[in-house]
């Protein structure tokens, strides 16, 4: 529904359809695309050396469904992050020496993958991950899409009716500050939830679950997170110098066969990059300071007074502290 309020989504969440081959990811993208723009919609691939093609698509189309983004495409994480923040694309006009042109992203972007390589933490925080499993039985696509066409008018009518109700109610519910990075999405959902009489609690609970799903996506296959989780849970670490933590985690990673940073410097940089993921996965507040002689020290403070072992999502109080 936020798509009907462009002024309230300067930042954009990207639906990500994730799952094994044959789980219906492509069909899911096609269903949403056909619902919103009609039966001519179809998904498109993303090519390793064709960032210009992606820019052209998201600055000209109404909807773009990137399908099977499985291989490592160097520009894709940055492209997703730029799209999510609605950055204008500044390009040199073709066949000129120094003439610039700019384009704004306008499409609703979706992406699907069975082996995502775009799970950088800053990108993961901008995704709406939807996990798919293979069904027990398959239906032909023409049957699925025929059913959609029969009900498309009624569904779109209901969506537009709900959008009108929300537009009338939003002025009565001013936005609140929330501890959720994609503030436009978080604030819009909180205002809608409040306008429906449900209060903020249910929406904030959903944001907590979303944050957990995003952190799991970002940490999937990450040896640093896996090694640090083992060390933290086994030794209940509260505070430790980064160099000592590196050696402990490196020993676990070596024993378990995890991919792990080779140097303490790289380890320290990754700690900073993965800070938000570590907080959610370990259920802690991650803090750092400089000790004697400039030694970098990190702290893992149990959240809400517990031991942080379950890594549960944030509470309503956490989200509203702003």
Q: Locations of the language-model features?
A:
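P-loop NTPase catalytic core of nucleic-acid-dependent motor ATPases
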Residues: 1-60
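DNA transaction DNA-binding modules
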Residues: 21, 66, 71-72, 147, ...
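Conserved catalytic/switch belt of AAA+ P-loop NTPases
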Residues: 37, 77-101
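Short glycine-/polar-rich loops that comprise or flank the Walker A/P-loop
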Residues: 39, 60-62, 87-90, 105-108, ...
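AAA+/SF3 P-loop NTPase mechanochemical coupling elements
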Residues: 53-59, 93-112
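Conserved AAA+/SF3 P-loop NTPase catalytic/coupling segment centered on the Walker-B
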Residues: 62-85, 116-125
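Structural recognition of the conserved hydrophobic beta-strand(s) that form the central parallel beta-sheet
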Residues: 65-67, 92, 104-113, 129-130, ...
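Short regulatory helix/loop adjacent to the ATP-binding pocket of P-loop NTPases
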Residues: 114-128, 133, 140-141, 159
């Amino acid at each position: 529904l936020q798509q009907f309020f462009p002024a309230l989504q300067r930042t954009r969440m990207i639906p990500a359809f994730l799952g094994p081959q044959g789980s219906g990811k492509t069909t899911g993208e096609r269903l949403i695309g056909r619902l919103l723009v009609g039966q001519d919609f179809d998904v498109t691939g993303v090519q390793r050396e064709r960032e210009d093609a992606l820019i052209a698509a998201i600055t000209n189309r109404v909807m773009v469904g990137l399908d099977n983004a499985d291989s490592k495409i160097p520009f894709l994480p940055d492209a997703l992050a730029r799209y999510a923040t609605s950055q204008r694309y500044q390009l040199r006009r073709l066949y000129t020496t120094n003439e610039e042109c700019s384009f704004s992203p306008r499409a609703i972007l979706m992406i699907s993958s069975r082996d995502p390589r775009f799970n950088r933490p800053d990108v993961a925080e901008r995704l709406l991950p939807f996990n798919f499993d293979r069904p027990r039985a398959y239906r032909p696509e023409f049957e699925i899409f025929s059913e959609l066409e029969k009900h498309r008018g009624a569904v779109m009518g209901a969506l537009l009716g709900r959008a009108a109700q929300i537009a009338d109610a939003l002025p009565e519910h001013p936005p609140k500050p929330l501890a959720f990075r994609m503030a436009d999405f978080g604030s819009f959902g909180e205002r809608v939830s409040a306008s429906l009489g449900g209060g903020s609690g249910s929406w904030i609970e959903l944001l907590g679950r979303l944050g957990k799903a995003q952190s799991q996506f970002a940490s999937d296959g990450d040896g640093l997170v896996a090694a640090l989780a083992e060390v933290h849970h086994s030794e209940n670490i509260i505070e430790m110098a980064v160099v000592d933590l590196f050696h402990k985690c490196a020993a676990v990673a070596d024993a378990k066969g995890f991919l792990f940073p080779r140097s303490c410097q790289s380890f320290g940089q990754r700690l900073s990059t993965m800070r938000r993921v570590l907080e959610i996965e370990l259920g802690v507040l991650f803090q750092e300071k400089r000790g004697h002689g400039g030694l970098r020290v990190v702290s893992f403070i149990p959240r809400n007074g517990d031991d942080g072992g379950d890594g549960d999502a944030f509470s309503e109080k956490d989200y509203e502290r702003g």
